[in-house]
Amino acid sequence: MRTLRHFTLSLLLAITAPLLVSQQPSIIYSTSYNSHFPDGVTGGGEAWNGMGVAHDGTLYYVLSSGSPNIAGQMYSFNPKTQVITHLADLSDIVGEGNMKAVAQGKSHVNFVEANGKLYFSTHLGYYNQAGGLERAGAPPPGYLPYLGGHFVSYDLTTGKFENLAKAPGGEGIITFNMDVQRGRLYGITWPTGHFLRYDLKTKKLKDFGTLFLGGESGVIGSTYRGICRRIIVDPRDGSAYFTTGEGTIHRYHYDTEVIDDVPGITLKKDYFGTQDIAGHGMAYNWRAAFFNPTDNAIYAVNGRSGYLFRVDINTPSVQVLKRITSEPSTASGMFDRFEYGYMGFTLGPDGHTVYYLTGAPIPSRPNTAGTTNPNRRADGCHFVTYDLTTKKYVDHGQLVLEDGTPVAAPQSIAVGLDGTVYTISYVPRNGKRTIELISFHP
């Protein structure tokens, strides 16, 4: 009998041991840098996109500020020499550095390179929280209100910045892309969601108004609408696509400058769960997206559910491919805590692998009372890939800093020429939390 028990126990351990091992999350160690971001920034700063790798492999990035009097700062990083260079203060480059106005706190967009220049836009970073929502912060005594986001270029040879145009109505430019071939810049403003076009040849800005009802200044449950964070340009004909929370895909036509709806398709899918289009979050907008020239399709992710999907405008059709949340999130069966979703989403250097930085519950993290609550969910960060050719999903594991501290709140991604992945995370330094550049190798 004892022999049988020992045999049964041994067999059980042999079967379950591999399962137990496989459930232990892999760890990816990252390297953090020191950009010498200004002290005194409220909340340690933020980072939402604000990155890009130029043709020579140099990384350009912006560390954002939530303070009314400290602007976001732009830097370059040379991967060969490991040297970080401070390039500019965002308020200075648009001529507002000495105006004592609420600062240009962010660049909320990915940089686009064209004809020897980087193009991007600026945005405000100073908010007031009202009922759990971000509203433009009232200027401190003696300060002017925020003056509006700008379209900006940076000459990679001369180092000169050029202020191209300013958004009307004192709104920031939260979403940006560029038609490189035709020389047009596109943006969506915050908080009301006006669609903008700037033409490099004519140097004229056009405001098409908003399709977002009250935008993110609207009333929750009524006129509130989350604003799309990605404009996708089809290089074949210059069409620019963006979404609204109802799940509609809108198309700007380059030749006629008309905006209409893509007929016959919607991003409102049962798989994405029931989304409140007037509630806090992205609803049925795509959260992040890119155009894949291999099959001339748009690949995007639904922010709340983490489902990857493919949009074929020519058919037209929407195909749900795979939930690409982290393994811990998938196993929990729950949404990630951050209802907006994640923007660290891009096509890898091989042209067929999706790179995605996504949230994950950190188990057994102490709560504010100092005790452990197994039901409390706090976001860590996992690096996930999905091969569009083989349909293979891989969660490569949790990102941590050099000392094992979980990487927190990454909402940006850029891939170097050597395959190094860059993002921006909160980093503890000198007893404080600051925002900083980090990198890792997949």
In which residue ranges do the predicted regions lie?
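Beta-strand-rich domains and repeat architectures in extracellular enzymes and scaffolds
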Residues: 35-72
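Short, conserved, GDST-rich strand-edge loop motifs in beta-rich repeat architectures
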Residues: 64-68, 120-146, 356-380, 427-428
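Loop/turn-rich, solvent-exposed surfaces of beta-rich toroidal or solenoidal domains
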Residues: 300-302, 306, 333-388
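Beta-propeller blade signature
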Residues: 74-82, 137-157, 197, 308-312, ...
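Surface-exposed loop and turn segments in beta-propeller and other repeat-based domains
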Residues: 28, 32-40, 87-103, 162-171, ...
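Residue-level detector of Asp-centered blade-edge/turn motifs that repeat once per structural unit
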Residues: 53-56, 113-115, 180-182, 234-237, ...
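Conserved beta-propeller blade signature
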Residues: 59-62, 118-119, 184-187, 239-242, ...
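Blade-level signature of beta-propeller repeat domains, shared across WD40, Kelch, NHL, RCC1
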Residues: 407-442
